[in-house]
Amino acid sequence: MGEEKKPNTDDLEKGAGQKVDMKKEILSWVFYIAFVLVLTWVIITFVGQRTRVDGRSMMNTLHDGDNLIVEKLSYRFSDPKRFDIIVFPLTGKKEYYIKRIIGLPGETVQIDENGNIYINGELLEENYGAETIQNPGRAAKPITLGDDEYFVMGDNRNNSKDSRSEEVGNVKRSQIIGRAWLRIWPLNKFGLLKHQ
């Protein structure tokens, strides 16, 4: 009769070793995926996030469909500056607005019947608006900004819902998500955005 085959201890040890290696591999992948998820959350929450321009209110600087990186870090250490392009939500709404800062906290903003912007009674020298402002909205009368308020406008001045309207009004510092920093799409316009 045939010989009874004894299990090879080397084969048993090899199989057990493969199971341990497989567990280590799975555990390694779980930790890696968890790390990537936490890192992604930290970056989106504290550093920057992607956003898409929806509309024509910032033309000719930004165009409908442009994809941007909104940088959130610098405003943790310094205040927004005049002409920064910021992203903020309207109070109580989930949609985000992208506008340029015109008036800073404590300043008085007014737009005259000729479309000129005045800050504290002095003409603002700027060339972001492509055309003469036709409707000064609530800025036809002087608007004095609070200690934490900003007056914002779209670069497409006659096709922008911004601080001139009652719906948007002055933007509080706490509303500002971050500063539009980098255009990543379309690729032929890839680059840093002009703020100053």
Locate the predicted segments by residue.
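Protein maturation boundaries and topogenic segments
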Residues: 1-96, 171-175, 179-196
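Structural motif
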Residues: 66, 81-85, 107, 149, ...
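Short, surface-exposed secondary-structure boundary micro-motifs
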Residues: 73, 91, 114, 122, ...
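Mid-length scaffold segments of soluble, non-membrane domains
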Residues: 96-122
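PP2C/PPM family metal-dependent serine/threonine protein phosphatase catalytic domain
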Residues: 119-137
